[in-house]
Amino acid sequence: MNHLAEIESLLYVAGDEGITLQHIARLIMLDEAAVRQLLTKLAKRYQEDEQSGLNLIQAADCYKLVTKKAYAGLLKAYFDGPVSTSISQAALEVLAIIVYRQPLTRIEIDEVRGVQSSGAIQTLLARQLIVEKGRKDAPGRPILYGTSDYFLDYFGLGSLKELPELEQMTLTDDTAESDNDSADLYYRQFEQTLNETGPETAPKGEQ
């Protein structure tokens, strides 16, 4: 198997949190020196490839993929557009989970949804609907996420206490068995807030 492709896929799913060299080495079963060489090679490839909008950087002890500075204006124009046209239902689902379970890590969000959530988290961060709330005291010290003050302003809320209580939902044995159903429960409850207090044009799903 192509080790560079393996590393690239790990960097992609790791998202903004990044992934350590040691973690990569364990997952692809190579020694750290070999992984370091591969990371250097991959970083050089991104840097020299004019057909790619990405770079590979090292931040503290983690490696992560980031967009090239040359495209900052383009990305700003995208994220400055109406929320209703650029937030997917997946991002809203992640936002709903964060709303009711904050602060929590990306991995904890993934566990609720049953799928990887890095892309949705990046969208919400760029939209300033969520912010980093420190780091969890756990191996790797993963980032904790929570809602921002702008989240309250955008949805017309004075405080999180105005949200419908999660306990009002009816949890059946059938729904409790599935991660996807559990995530859907958070979303349905949050959707009530979108309908009652959110902007006139509520964000619509793209997928």
Swiss-Prot record:
The family database entries (Pfam families) matched by this protein are listed as: SMC_ScpB (PF04079)
Q: Where in the cell is it found?
A: Cytoplasm
Question: Which keywords has UniProt assigned to this entry?
Answer: Cell cycle, Cell division, Chromosome partition, Cytoplasm
Q: Does the keyword Cell inner membrane apply?
A: no
GO CC annotation terms, alphabetical: cytoplasm
Q: Report any one BP term from Gene Ontology.
A: chromosome separation
The cross-references to InterPro entries, in alphabetical order and at most eight, read: ScpB_csome_segregation, WH-like_DNA-bd_sf, WH_DNA-bd_sf
Classify the source by domain of life. Bacteria
Which region ranges are annotated with the description Disordered? 173-207
Concerning its family, UniProt says: Belongs to the ScpB family.
Query: Which PANTHER family does its entry note?
Result: SEGREGATION AND CONDENSATION PROTEIN B
- Subunit details for this protein? Homodimer. Homodimerization may be required to stabilize the binding of ScpA to the Smc head domains. Component of a cohesin-like complex composed of ScpA, ScpB and the Smc homodimer, in which ScpA and ScpB bind to the head domain of Smc. The presence of the three proteins is required for the association of the complex with DNA.
Per its database record, what is this protein's job? Participates in chromosomal partition during cell division. May act via the formation of a condensin-like complex containing Smc and ScpA that pull DNA away from mid-cell into both cell halves.
Protein name in the entry? Segregation and condensation protein B
